[in-house]
Amino acid sequence: MPSLSEAYRAHPVHVNHKHPDFNSLQELPESYNWTHLDDHTLIDSNNIMKESTTTVPVIDLNDPNASKLIGLACKTWGVYQVMNHGIPLSLLEDIQWLGQTLFSLPSHQKHKATRSPDGVSGYGIARISSFFPKLMWYEGFTIVGSPLDHFRELWPQDYTRFCDIVVQYDETMKKLAGTLMCLMLDSLGITKEDIKWAGSKAQFEKACAALQLNSYPSCPDPDHAMGLAPHTDSTFLTILSQNDISGLQVNREGSGWITVPPLQGGLVVNVGDLFHILSNGLYPSVLHRVLVNRTRQRFSVAYLYGPPSNVEICPHAKLIGPTKPPLYRSVTWNEYLGTKAKHFNKALSSVRLCTPINGLFDVNDSNKNSVQVG
């Protein structure tokens, strides 16, 4: 079975750039200056709280109506936050501490674990960087499988405790992701038994995942810098833990960019492209970006969750019929990563079969229209 790492190796990212020492920069370099930005102001958190229609839904997983609430959030937002999710606060603090410790290392030390162009694991810039003319005020560390080799380079004398945190975090996140997957499917009238690759225990034990540690250093000119440029995730879903520094924004039709405020103990869940496909477009993947702060450093940890890399994903049979044809063709995560590497945010459009027009479907449509996301 092809692994997620092999899928990334098949689509190398060639960006001839190494991170500067962000802390030493007193001015924003031209290569990081996004001068064309005209909507680059964080929405005031007080205004968000007053306007409930512009607040990302927060869902208590102990609520007996959690599945219904999640379905509504997925349909209308493509993103939601969860509380009472079962992940110990101490573990969330441990993984944040690991990220802060890693990104606080001297530049020469971090570069010992640099991700290779055809690799997925290690330290480096955002994989989406090649699609933009300017660089992002960002550094990341991706983990697929064991982090042992890279952590030995970073902490020769003390790597085991860092590895232990990653293993524990991965195990607990995989369980939570499976739970969220079941709730999202249930909201569509689909049971986990309806998913052939769910495994003998119907617990999605064969699912693939990657862990992404993100750092957004304080920036001398945040109004003209971009932490992470707008994109959707290729996943089924992405679970994000963030520190107390705002910056994550999601795009919602009619509202523009909406800030997702950090909640202590809360986790952000993004709908990804593969669930967009599985739901036949009912649950759109969310377009999101990250802005930076003048005086504070933002950290986040993303758990990128998807199917086994060679399993074909298509609109589920329960969601299609004579008046509801499939909008997307079958695609594996492995193949879709290649499509994403080539077409980026037009990847969904490239696997579309037909487009609804005034409530009807043009089955002869050949990817003529762009995908509306958010």
Curated annotation (Swiss-Prot):
GO terms for biological process: gibberellin biosynthetic process. It catalyses: gibberellin A20 + 2-oxoglutarate + O2 = gibberellin A1 + succinate + CO2. Residues 206-307 form the Fe2OG dioxygenase domain. InterPro entries: DIOX_N, IPNS-like_FE2OG_OXY, IPNS-like_sf, Iron_ascorbate_oxido_reductase, Oxoglu/Fe-dep_dioxygenase_dom. Its cofactor is L-ascorbate; Fe(2+). Disruption phenotype: Dwarf phenotype. Its EC number is 1.14.11.15. Fe cation binds at H231, D233, H288. It is an enzyme of class 1 (oxidoreductase). 2-oxoglutarate binds at R298. The active site is at R298. PROSITE patterns: FE2OG_OXY (PS51471). Gene3D superfamilies: B-lactam Antibiotic, Isopenicillin N Synthase, Chain. It holds the Pfam family DIOX_N. Keywords: Dioxygenase, Iron, Metal-binding, Oxidoreductase. Changing H276Y: In le-3; strongly decreased catalytic activity producing a dwarf phenotype. Strongly decreased catalytic activity producing a dwarf phenotype. PANTHER family: 2-OXOGLUTARATE (2OG) AND FE(II)-DEPENDENT OXYGENASE SUPERFAMILY PROTEIN-RELATED. The Le gene controls the stem length trait studied by Gregor Mendel in 1866. Converts the inactive gibberellin (GA) precursors GA9 and GA20 in the bioactives gibberellins GA4 and GA1. Has a small activity on GA29, producing GA8. Unable to convert GA20 to GA5, GA5 to GA3 or GA12 to GA14. Involved in the production of bioactive GA for vegetative growth and development, but not for the 3-beta-hydroxylation of GA in developing seeds. Belongs to the iron/ascorbate-dependent oxidoreductase family. GA3OX subfamily. This is Gibberellin 3-beta-dioxygenase 1. It comes from Pisum sativum.
